[in-house]
């Protein structure tokens, strides 16, 4: 899969979660902050990243840099996705279903951020299992990576789109 250059895109950032984490040492606890950020151009490109630092803004900055390195391209048909898909990560699972125009983004928390920044405006989703933000974001990404356009599938099978769709 080819790398997407983040400098050519107008990316919007959204902080999904900021967590205070502690390392217990002999003298007490060392506190740091971890941040989960989703970036996207609302036109079929989206990425997520995590960052950890002693200060919240620094953690967010690191997460944004990380997110720009993990961009993926999402096939969008009109305002929705081409077909139904199930994304998995750990104990988290998310079902993504295409929806008719005007439905809106029906998704909870972290998944909503990913789908909106990907540029999908009509979709139904259901999160099952783990509801930790990082697991939900990764499961959503897994689902989005599985999506294929009808033209791509037809080319792989050596058929026309009409033959494929009947």
From Swiss-Prot:
Membrane keyword on record: no
What is the superkingdom listed in this entry's lineage?
Bacteria
Entry GO MF terms = rRNA binding; structural constituent of ribosome
Q: Which InterPro entries match?
A: Ribosomal_Su5_D2-typ_SF, Ribosomal_uS5, Ribosomal_uS5_bac-type, Ribosomal_uS5_C, Ribosomal_uS5_N, Ribosomal_uS5_N_CS, Ribsml_uS5_D2-typ_fold_subgr
One Pfam family of this chain:
Ribosomal_S5
Tell me yes or no: is Acyltransferase among this UniProt entry's keywords. Answer: no
**Domain S5 DRBM as annotated: residue spans:** 11-74
Keyword annotations: Ribonucleoprotein, Ribosomal protein, RNA-binding, rRNA-binding
Q: Which GO terms describe its biological process?
A: translation
Task: Output the Gene Ontology cellular-component terms.
Answer: small ribosomal subunit
Q: Record's PANTHER family?
A: MITOCHONDRIAL RIBOSOMAL PROTEIN S5
What job does this protein perform? With S4 and S12 plays an important role in translational accuracy.
Domain description from the entry?
Answer: The N-terminal domain interacts with the head of the 30S subunit; the C-terminal domain interacts with the body and contacts protein S4. The interaction surface between S4 and S5 is involved in control of translational fidelity.
Quaternary form? Part of the 30S ribosomal subunit. Contacts proteins S4 and S8.
| Name assigned to this protein | Small ribosomal subunit protein uS5
Source organism per UniProt: Geobacillus kaustophilus (strain HTA426)
């Amino acid at each position: 899969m080819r790398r997407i250059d983040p400098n050519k895109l107008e990316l919007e950032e959204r902080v999904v979660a900021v967590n205070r984490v502690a390392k217990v040492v002999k003298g007490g606890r060392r506190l740091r902050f971890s941040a989960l950020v989703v970036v996207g151009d609302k036109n079929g490109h989206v990425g997520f990243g995590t960052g950890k630092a002693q200060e919240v803004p620094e953690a967010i900055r690191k997460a944004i840099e990380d997110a720009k390195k993990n961009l993926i391209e999402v096939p969008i048909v009109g305002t929705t996705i081409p077909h139904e898909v199930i994304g998995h990560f750990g104990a988290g699972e998310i079902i993504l279903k295409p929806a008719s125009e005007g439905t809106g983004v029906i998704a909870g928390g972290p998944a909503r951020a990913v789908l909106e920044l990907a540029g999908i405006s009509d979709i139904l989703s259901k999160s099952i299992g783990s509801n930790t933000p990082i697991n939900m974001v990764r499961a959503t990404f897994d689902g989005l990576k599985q999506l294929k356009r009808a033209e791509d599938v037809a080319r792989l099978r050596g058929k026309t789109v009409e033959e494929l769709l009947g």
